[in-house]
Structure formats: structure tokens, C-alpha cells
Amino acid sequence: MVKKAIFGGTFDPIHNGHIHIAYEAIYRLGLDEIVFMPTGNPPHKAKKSITDAFLRYEMVKVAIRSESKFTVSNYEVNKTTLSYTYSTLEHFNKLESKTEWYFLTGADCLMDIEKWSRVDSIFRLCKFIVFNRPGFPAFTSESIEDQKKKIEDKYSTNIIYLDAPLFDISSTVIRNSVKEGKNVNYFLPESVCNIIKQLNLYK
């Protein structure tokens, strides 16, 4: 069976840390494909200002264009309504019913997962892969370990922990650094840097 993981996020902007995690998921877990899913109108960030969805999609597209096992979907970007994870998973399960679907996200999301819409459907439609993110407690901390076990027991699911080396950078830090005029070339694919410079983003 083909195994694919949806890697959802605002990707504002996509950076080398995202790409590093996607590589780790492919090679450590034997996945066939990572589908990057830039969010269109995420409910948890409805009140926050984020870069235009089509620009974020374009940055992901150019960042991964040379990677044979990476693809990018405009499914959520093209939606005019709020983007919910369960809805996206339902769509892709219907589209590729014989594919085994996974959802790749930060381990910190486990702490708020039960606030997500139709969380029971989410765990029915996919298997979760979680990874550590900079600025959040390590996955081995007691609170996240307890939450992992609680979710697994409650929803009869198995959450996979991707124990990958941490790339210490975040999109927030990159945006702030660009605003302050700092060099961020090391943290981004060259193609993404070019878009940011050409369109004067994050100033």
C-alpha cells in the first residue's frame, strides 16, 4: 500500500527546517510521498495576519520543485471557507482510497488537539506523525508524553514520534529577522529568498 503524509502548515514562509523534517519522515518511516498543504484560512489563526495564501503556496512550490517525493497541494488554498483538517483528510481519503494516509505535525499540537474540529474523524482518517519544534517543550517532557498516551487510549490510535534532529529555526523568527534587515539566506531555499526579496515580504 502506498503511504503518504499530509504536512499541513501556514508555511509563512517555508524554511529548511520544514524540508528537513519532510526528508526525515520519508526515510525513517518509509513514506512514499509528502504532500505539503499550505493552509488557506486556518480557524486557529483567523484573527492573525498571515501572508496571502497563494504567495505561501508559490513559495512551497518553488522550494520543493526538485524533490521527487515532495508535492504541494492547493486544495486548502483554493477554498473560500475556513480550512479544517478533518475536511482535508476526508477529501484525500476519497480521492485516493487505497492510500494509507498520515498527518505530519508538531508535537506541541497534541496539547490542543481536542480543540480541533471533529478530532475523532481525524484519527479515523489518518495516523499522526509528530516531531519536536523549536520554542516548544521537548517531546520527552512529562506533559506531552502524558497527552500522547491519553489521546492514544481515548481514540484507539497510535501516534508516531519522529525523533529527528532539531533544526533550530521558525517562520516567526525568519519574518522578524527580515523585518529587522537581518540575513536569513542560511535558513531558506534560495528560490524562497528570491520571492521574499522580489516582493518585499515581511517588511
UniProtKB/Swiss-Prot annotation:
InterPro entries linked to this entry: Cyt_trans-like (IPR004821), NadD/NMNAT (IPR005248), Rossmann-like_a/b/a_fold (IPR014729)
Gene3D superfamilies: HUPs
UniProt-listed Enzyme Commission number(s): 2.7.7.18
Pathway: Cofactor biosynthesis; NAD(+) biosynthesis; deamido-NAD(+) from nicotinate D-ribonucleotide: step 1/1
Molecular function per GO: ATP binding; nicotinate-nucleotide adenylyltransferase activity
Pfam family, one: CTP_transf_like
Catalytic activities: nicotinate beta-D-ribonucleotide + ATP + H(+) = deamido-NAD(+) + diphosphate
Keyword set, alphabetical order: ATP-binding, NAD, Nucleotide-binding, Nucleotidyltransferase, Pyridine nucleotide biosynthesis, Transferase
Stretches of the chain forming a coiled coil according to its record: none
A GO BP annotation: NAD biosynthetic process
Function: Catalyzes the reversible adenylation of nicotinate mononucleotide (NaMN) to nicotinic acid adenine dinucleotide (NaAD).
Family: Belongs to the NadD family.
Entry protein name: Probable nicotinate-nucleotide adenylyltransferase
Gene responsible for this protein: nadD
